[in-house]
């Protein structure tokens, strides 16, 4: 098995890619690898490898993916709640990857489990990275419960998984919300949610809890034909080679002291207004971009000035887990760029 020694150059690459962050407490925990009172990022990655297999050079979760490149056309409305330059009126380069959950990059598509990770390049060398999912809420409120839920589900024992849900009301409530949410079988038509809460900091210093959504603008490609094991990705590749996919980025400000920031399983009231802050345009990524995207850690705690992490413990857990996944694959022969749509 080919491996690479983790030298100083690669360590600096880890830092540049966001595997090592220094965003307050979240950065400290990511550096240390701690996820909870007893867990570490290694605990989660070991679980993914043990239950889903180890695929050299790939992410340990969300391994199957397609890279995209594009831009964010900000309309300036987001400046109402955040001083982040991404919300000032203008255009910013974006790269990202559509993926599905799982350690196996060759798993057949099921029409569910879509995710979208993005990196916005901003003035002054700042970046905003976000890793979203086509689900309304997260599966567990704490790292410990998340680990227990994953252990039960990935064990393949349906009775064990059912017992865990039955014994953990927070996970059970989240599962009901996820199952009841509208489903889209294609990447192009799915709605992607931030899952966690963040803090928007305004120019006046006002601090507002926020969540966000990326929603299709209604003109993206329709439901694909379910032909072959990669039908979701082949349809996506065909769509972006034939044109661009367009989405709207919506910020949802919360009410401080009323809307929960610490628990990603809890939805906010449906009547909370949203702010349309601009248009996300995604298209085909050339090979050089695909290679960089493959090697990027889409750590959701990599944030620009004007956006901060909240008290949600899942955020720091995600940072540590993503960092450990990055460290392991950085020592390995890089995976090939995604081959989907080569004949499209």
Give, region by region, the residue ranges found by the protein language model.
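Active-site-adjacent core segments of small-molecule enzymes
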Residues: 2-344
């Amino acid at each position: 098995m080919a491996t690479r020694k983790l030298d100083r150059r690669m360590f600096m690459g880890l830092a540049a890619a966001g595997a090592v962050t220094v965003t307050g407490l979240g950065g400290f925990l990511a550096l240390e690898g701690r996820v909870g009172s007893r867990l570490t990022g290694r605990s989660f990655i070991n679980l993914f490898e043990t239950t889903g297999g180890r695929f050299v050079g790939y992410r340990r979760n969300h391994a199957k993916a397609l890279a995209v490149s594009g831009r964010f056309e900000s309309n300036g409305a987001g400046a109402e709640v955040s001083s982040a330059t991404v919300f000032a009126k203008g255009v910013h380069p974006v790269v990202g990857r559509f993926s599905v959950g799982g350690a196996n990059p060759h798993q057949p598509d099921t029409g569910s489990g879509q995710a979208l990770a993005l990196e916005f390049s901003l003035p002054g060398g700042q970046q905003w990275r976000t890793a979203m999912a086509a689900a309304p809420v997260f599966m567990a409120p704490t790292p410990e419960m998340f680990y227990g839920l994953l252990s039960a589900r990935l064990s393949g024992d349906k009775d064990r998984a059912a017992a865990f849900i039955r014994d953990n009301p927070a996970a059970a409530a989240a599962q009901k919300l996820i199952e009841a949410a509208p489903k889209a079988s294609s990447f192009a038509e799915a709605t992607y949610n931030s899952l966690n809460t963040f803090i928007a900091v305004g120019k006046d210093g006002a601090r507002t809890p926020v969540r966000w959504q990326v929603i299709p603008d209604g003109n993206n490609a329709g439901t694909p034909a379910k032909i072959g094991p990669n039908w979701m990705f082949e349809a996506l590749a065909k769509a972006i080679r034939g044109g661009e996919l367009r989405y709207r980025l919506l910020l949802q400000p919360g009410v401080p002291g009323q809307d929960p920031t610490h628990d990603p399983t809890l939805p906010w009231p449906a009547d909370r207004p949203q702010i349309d802050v601009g248009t996300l345009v995604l298209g085909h990524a050339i090979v050089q971009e695909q290679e960089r995207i493959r090697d990027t850690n889409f750590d959701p705690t990599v944030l620009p000035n004007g956006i901060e992490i909240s008290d949600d413990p899942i955020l720091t857990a995600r940072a540590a887990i993503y960092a450990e996944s990055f460290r392991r694959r950085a020592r390995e022969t890089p995976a090939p760029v995604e081959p989907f749509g080569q004949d499209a």
